[in-house]
């Protein structure tokens, strides 16, 4: 099945659609979302990170947020987040209304293979203490709960371990969680 992305302008207004790979080849601004699930433990918050599969056409073998993708045409980002949690890691217990939508940011980054990310990226979070998962090997090679300390340590020591968008997503999530606690 050919996948399409929703092209947007700098204000976030939809202006068309394009095949996903072509949009990444041309570096055109399009809608995306990043889901980051977290849980509270006795030692603090932990975040569920995925390691992107070796077969992904960009950012392969990089640690990133729980899941990320692009909403389909006329698909709400929270519904898309729920859909991709199921498709990527087999999580079915998170409903669209459980997400807190932190809004969006725009970023652009050159990737390997001559591709470019240029996304209006919505950040969706949910506190999910008890989730089970089944990895889709075409999407994800590993999944782990990471403490704040472990993420910070790895981002300082080995920043290339993570996808280019993850540090921004993570910092925005931390800022939000610190403000509400």
UniProtKB/Swiss-Prot annotation:
Question: Which positions are annotated as binding Mn(2+)?
Answer: 24, 30, 70, 117, 119
Q: Where is the active site?
A: 68, 119
UniProt keywords, alphabetically: Cytoplasm, Isomerase, Isoprene biosynthesis, Magnesium, Manganese, Metal-binding
Manganese recorded as keyword? yes
GO terms (molecular function) for this protein are:
isopentenyl-diphosphate delta-isomerase activity; metal ion binding
List, alphabetically, the SUPFAM superfamilies matched: Nudix
User: From what superkingdom does this record's organism come?
Assistant: Bacteria
One Pfam family, short name please? NUDIX
What is the E.C. number?
5.3.3.2
| Cellular compartments annotated | Cytoplasm
Gene3D superfamilies linked to this entry: Nucleoside Triphosphate Pyrophosphohydrolase
User: Any idea which positions bind Mg(2+)?
Assistant: 68, 88
Pathway(s) served: Isoprenoid biosynthesis; dimethylallyl diphosphate biosynthesis; dimethylallyl diphosphate from isopentenyl diphosphate: step 1/1
User: What does the entry comment about cofactor binding?
Assistant: Binds 1 Mg(2+) ion per subunit. The magnesium ion binds only when substrate is bound. Binds 1 Mn(2+) ion per subunit.
Q: Which GO BP terms apply?
A: dimethylallyl diphosphate biosynthetic process; isopentenyl diphosphate biosynthetic process
**What's any one GO cellular component for it?**
cytoplasm
Q: Which reaction does it catalyse?
A: isopentenyl diphosphate = dimethylallyl diphosphate
The UniProt function text for this chain reads: Catalyzes the 1,3-allylic rearrangement of the homoallylic substrate isopentenyl (IPP) to its highly electrophilic allylic isomer, dimethylallyl diphosphate (DMAPP).
Write out the similarity annotation: Belongs to the IPP isomerase type 1 family.
Q: What is this protein called?
A: Isopentenyl-diphosphate Delta-isomerase
Q: Which gene underlies this protein?
A: idi
